[in-house]
Amino acid sequence: MIDRVTALARASFGELLKRPILLALPGIALALGAVTGGAIAYAPDDAIVDALRQYEPSLVTRIHGRDGEQYAEWLTQRREVVAYEDIAPVMVNAVVATEDAKFFSHVGIDPLAVVRSLIADIRCGYFCEGFSTITMQIPRNLDRYLGGETWLPKSKTLTRKIREGIYAIQIERHYTKEQIFAIYANQIFMGSKVYGFQSAAKFYFGKSISDVNLPEAALLAGIIQTPNSFRPDLNPERAVRKRNVVLGRMLAEGFISDEEHAVASIAPLVLADEDNADGIGDYFTEEIRKRLITEYGMDGIYRGGLRVNTTLDNRVQTAAEVALDKGIRAVDKAAGWRGATTNLLQEGADLETWVHPAWFDRIEPGNIVKAVVLEVEPERARVRFMDQVAELTPEDIEWTNRTRLHRLVEPGDLIEVKLKELREDGTWRLLLDQEPTLQGSVLVVENHTGEVTAMVGGRTFDQSEFNRATQAVRPTGSIFKPFVYSAAVQRGITPSELFVDQPETFYDASRQPYSPENFNNEYIGITSMAEALTKSRNVPTVMLQQKVGLTNVIDTARSFGLTADFQPYLSLGLGVMDISVWEIVRAYTVFPNQGVLVEPHLVKEVFDRNGRLLEEAERQARKVLSSDEAYVMARILVAGIQRGTGVRAKPLANELGLMLGGKSGTTDDRTNTWYVGFSPNHTVGVWLGHDDNQRIHRYATGASSALPIWIDVMRAAEDGASPAVLPMPNNIELRSVDVFTGLLYSEYCKESVELAYIAGTAPTRTCGPTERSILDLPPYQQTYFVSNGKLDTDGG
């Protein structure tokens, strides 16, 4: 019998058409009987059923922040699996009425539909009418995952139909109707990358499939046959017409009343609001994606339906992205107006009709948009963006330090403008802006847990996916100095150790001279070790490095987790080695963390599609400094914000009621600027620079360019935090000392600072009139009064 069926199936329609239709009917009946009988008698081992049991549909991997809210996803197909009970009955009825009216009564195939279809096909000479049931569509829809043409031929032949029928009957033997419908409902393609009714309901209507109403269910059912043709977001009129066809079928099948049909047929199409929210944490998410690919593979993360719980704090991440963009733009403007890079007239464009793709985005005050210059006069420039025409005046270009518009722009220039405010007459007040060439990165780590709450690897992920927080290594400048000073504290040198800050030449092991210079060539004479770090003095730092020993400094730096190829250069302590933001921030957490280095991490937990825990972050920590040593260093860095290069952050410390500490860094030729600092709860690092290592601008410093960004980010990280200080070990003594001599403070001293000392190492002498008189001498004369790091009032 099977041979006869196969022969019939392989017969061409041309041969069938040569026969009278009545002669063909016995063959049709024979084919129909063969389909049913063959399915029952000859189907090998229910192979389709075994495959279905092993089948795992492609699911969306969802990325959640620490608050549990989803903020990103990875997918090839947007699908959420739901049970039959979670599908609204009206949705079931709409699909059954449209796709398979006898679904709940047939055995997988509809014999009468088969006969009707074959007769129509013979008359047409090709497959002009289908007879698929919902059950028959399952192997077709799953074929991609069940072996391709091993299961069903791609071509539309009678052989394929017979196989579909056999598989359908096998499926019906082992699954209930409800189970079959659920398989179908979770697998069906619904346009775009949307698969399954649940995802379709959320995508088009912003609701669960359990909550759809009659017109919505009918519209979804109408999408099934040709999804992209009837997508309501792309073809609303066609989608509504198709919806009404489905409603007609539901009425004909008795699923709805005449009144329900009439009301639903005129229901307005109401779709979910388009999600205009900008994505956050692109660099953060990409870093996770790269790591998880090595663990679970591409299929695992794009089809596996994982739930990834991350350490990202949505609020802090958003603040970091905004702060970096704002800070970069401010620093970039300080470098001056570079001029427009594109002129549309030179490209042959019509200025009145040219459209920028971003003009279709929602606009509001504060946005920065592209605008076309239409006309220019010395004190006025007319520009167009979207359907708006506005003017720029001299006060709108104030940051350029120019007043004549015609010397800045010309007709056809494509420029950036900031929407300052919408006036009462409906026109916009604009400010001239420019696309920055500067880049930067931000990293925020929770001290005690190592959780990374925010990471920004560049100004715009769409323009550059290179992560400057993890992948870039740059010279650090003075933010490396705390590791030199830590090496000193480890070896018993106290914050009151004295140096004479003046020009000096040092010689390396090969007798090569090295003459470091202070910032702006300023020298102050006698200074304490703490003050040298607080005010970022280069010469005393090299002196301290020589006293500690280059090898010891390198060993200490490596113990902090810094992996640069350190060489014993005399310039080492001034930050000539290339280090990443990730490593520097990780190292700085040691100071507020009682000497413990905690490995930063981005992922807290990963679960599979069934909720089974695949991995969970474990706190990885090791001791780098003793609690006493860490506290001594932390208090010196706190002084850096109270009165040093980070003093701009002092109001923030007062505002938050938190002890803040940190260090700025600026490299030679001002090509890199840094600020890294901490609170009792978080450590934040900021870097700015160009990818091609060109100078930022001639006045750029870490304190002027990176620190303002750091302040904004730290404020967000600590929002809502209770006032706190760093926990002080029992073996620590606090003393108010003179910043220059390191002696106990008195009225004769110039300035005081509160510093920490390990018990038994605090100064016992008080600064008096003699010490004050020494400080009034020129630096070269002060040298005679410093011996072995201490003040000798007898002059040696």
Task: Give the residues covered by each predicted segment.
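N-terminal type II signal-anchor transmembrane helix
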Residues: 1-64, 102, 122
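Active-site loop and adjoining helix of the penicillin-binding protein/serine DD-peptidase-beta-lactamase fold
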Residues: 168, 172, 224-242, 303-313, ...
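A penicillin-recognizing enzyme superfamily signal
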Residues: 310, 314-326, 330, 351-354, ...
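Conserved catalytic neighborhood of penicillin-recognizing serine enzymes
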Residues: 124-146, 210, 277-280, 448, ...
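Peptidoglycan glycan-strand catalytic modules in the bacterial/periplasmic cell-wall system
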Residues: 31, 58-60, 64-262, 460, ...
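Active-site SXXK
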Residues: 95-96, 250, 320, 378, ...
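Short, well-structured active-site flanking segments
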Residues: 104-114, 195-198, 257-260, 489-508, ...
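Non-catalytic structural connector segments
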Residues: 252, 257-363, 379, 517-521, ...
